[in-house]
Amino acid sequence: DMTTDEGQAAFSYYTWNNGGGFVDENNDWALNSDANVEALNYAIGLVNDGYTNSDPANETRYDLQDMFGAGKVAMMIGPNNIPTYLSDGGYEVNYEVASIPSNEGCDSVAMGVCDRLEVFKDDAAEDQEARTAAITKFFDFFYDDSRYSDYMIYEGFLPTTQTAADLLAKDDETFASWIDILQSCNFYPATKTEWADVKQGVIEVEQNALLGDDVQTLLDDLQADIAG
């Protein structure tokens, strides 16, 4: 999926699993690193050699999931709710969950997406102590092991707490596979102010590379635009 829907995810999977990524060890943008250039050239090569879906610039992750369910794609990177997606779509396919392939000498890295439950302290509030007590009561209620586990199942999310992870893995082998993968997750550098431009930029790099433009030049230009 190199579409405007999730093209930044494709960039992540290939670069992270080649030892690259969006930023370097100092959290500075490193979009044109050697590892990224190599990874993206490899990905484009897979497309050009006919090893992928035929139109990655227009076929979204949902199209890919349907192709996988129909037996038209042998291997795909998918979300933890893929079992439900396939079942709801009436697909019957024999498959297993595995770690994402990585280049020799590189760790396997998966994509992590984190939703946050946050509250904010108001030091000027005269009743802040009572507010804190109410918030604590709610958090204790929400993160009760049984209740929180049920909520994860209902939403199709993966848990934050180890106790919920243990409960879900015990009851469902599917959950166990996904929980194991959590340990290898990276996250987008979404707190950096340039992230929106980077996200759009790497998608444009992919799509222009699919049209035949030089990957090194495209990433050099993006790095210059973002980091100066």
Residue ranges and their predicted role:
Residues A98, M152-E206:
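Long, aromatic- and glycine/proline-rich binding clefts that accommodate carbohydrate-like moieties
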Residues A74-P79, E96:
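Paired acidic/hydrophobic, glycine-rich loop segments that form the ligand-binding mouth/hinge
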Residues N26-A57:
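Glycine-centered hinge/linker elements that transmit conformational signals in sensory
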